[in-house]
C-alpha cells in the first residue's frame, strides 16, 4: 500500500514519505525506512535512542524494559540492579521517557549498560488523565509493532504525540490524529473516500463503517453488509479531515462532543478488529473520566448549585 506523508505543517511530516507494507504481506522492501539489524550481523555493543514503552520487575533488583527505537524497533532489555536505591539508571528509564541507551548483547535478553534521558515528559505522569492518554499512545504502538523491526516515521510520530500531550494540546485531536497516522504507517489506512464494497465514490451523506472491511460502505451496500455501523456525515468529514491534513490543520476545527465520541468509537472498533482484542488503556481512561465526572457532580452538590 502506498502511503502519503503526514501532510504539510505537521511536526512529523518533514520525514520522507515511505511505502510501508501491510504486516500481513511479510516482505519489507529495501529503502522504505524499515531496518532489521539481523541483516548486518549482531554487534556486541550498540547505542540507540528509544522511548520507554513499559517495564516489569524481575527478581529482587532487576527490570525488564520494553523500548521502541527508530532504527531497531521494539527492544526487550534487561536493566540489572535498576531497582536498587543507588542505581544511576533508574530515573532515566521511566515510562514515556526518550532515552539514549548503550546496550550489550546478552544470551537471552540484551542488557542496558548506560542510560541517559533526553526528554522525560514529566507532565505525562502528573495526573491520571494524562497518564492514561500517554499509556494508550505507547500501548497502541506496542501492539502494532514487532521486535527489532524499526520505523523512523513511527518513532517520530510517537515522540511528537507524547510531546503534544505533555504540552497540554487537546487530547481528542492528538489521539485521533495519532491513530490514523499510525494505521497508515502500519499499512492499515482506513478508506473514507470510496465504498469498500462497490468502489463507488462516497457522496456527502450518511454512510456505514465496517471495521472488518477497513472502511466506509455506501447506504446501498450497507443494508446487506453484516456488522455495518452507521456513520454520520459530520463524523465522516472529521475522519477525512484528520486523515488528509497535517497536525496543526487537523487539530484546528472545533468538533461537537457527540461527533467527537462517534469518531472515537469507530476508530476504537477498527483497532480492536485489527488487534483481535481490546486495548487496556481506553478502559482505564473511561474509569478516570467517570471518577472525575462524579467528583465534579459532588462538588456542585456541596456548593448548593445542583438540581433542586
What label would you give each PLM region?
Residues 5:
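Zn2+-dependent metallopeptidase catalytic domains
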Residues 16-17, 26-27:
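Generic short N-terminal amphipathic or hydrophobic helices
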Residues 22-23:
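Intrinsic disorder
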Residues 32-308:
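Non-catalytic alpha-helical scaffolds and adjoining flexible linkers that form interface surfaces
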